[in-house]
From Swiss-Prot:
Protein name: Rugosauperolein-2
Modified residues (Methionine amide): M11
GO biological process: defense response; neuropeptide signaling pathway; tachykinin receptor signaling pathway
Pfam families hit by this protein: Tachykinin (PF02202)
Its biological purpose: Tachykinins are active peptides which excite neurons, evoke behavioral responses, are potent vasodilators and secretagogues, and contract (directly or indirectly) many smooth muscles.
Family label: Belongs to the tachykinin family.
Disulfide bond positions: none
Entry keyword Protease: no
UniProtKB keywords: Amidation, Amphibian defense peptide, Neuropeptide, Pyrrolidone carboxylic acid, Secreted
InterPro entries cross-referenced by the UniProt entry: Tachy_Neuro_lke_CS (IPR013055), Tachykinin_dom (IPR008215)
Tissue-by-tissue expression: Expressed by the skin glands.
Pyrrolidone carboxylic acid modified-residue sites: Q1
GO cellular component annotations of the record: extracellular region
Length: 11
């Protein structure tokens, strides 16, 4: 499960 918040946070 990949959350968008985590994706942006990683960026």
């Amino acid at each position: 499960q990949a959350d968008p918040k985590t994706f942006y946070g990683l960026m």
